[in-house]
Amino acid sequence: KSGAIGKPVAVDATCTSLTEIGSDPDYFRKNWNSSCAWGPTALLPVFQILGTDYKDMRIASVFADEKKTFDRFSKFDFTFDCAVATVKVGSGVKSEGELIVSGTNGYVYVPAPWWKTDYFEVRYENATENKRYFYQLNGEGIRYEIVAFVKAVENGKMTDCVSQGISREICKVVSKRERTEIKA
């Protein structure tokens, strides 16, 4: 937001965990797939940085079950007017859980696990200009925003942590993944 990296042109967010995935059909009905478990967390920085007015979205998934109702891994690709974004989520799959925001003058690198990290780096072509910033996140990092949302629902009060527009768009994207699974 400060403009330190110039204009953002790409956001890449990855969230995965080596969660044990069962093979019993009841498991798939009772547990969150990767899009439900990690989608909201991974989508949040995309929509906070680039907004929600994307022109195209494509989803590719690897499924854990024969009925293709439980995505083990999904990749979401977004095209905006002047930017792109990629979100990768996985359950029972491991990847480097980093966040990278590419800009016209440099980029922001947040190391794995970026949703819990206590620092990030602003990096440039000339490495001597790179800076590391430290900050303290509450509890489990970005997940405190989700906890704040749950408390807001319980108390019947809106929260300022995440805008309604971003919340709606996250729900829409995850729902689209779910509707796609039902059709498969």
Predicted regions and their residues:
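Contiguous beta-strand/loop segments that form the cofactor/metal-binding neighborhood of enzyme cores
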Residues: 37-116, 147-157
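C-terminal helix-rich "cap/oligomerization" subdomain common to oxidoreductases
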Residues: 148-184
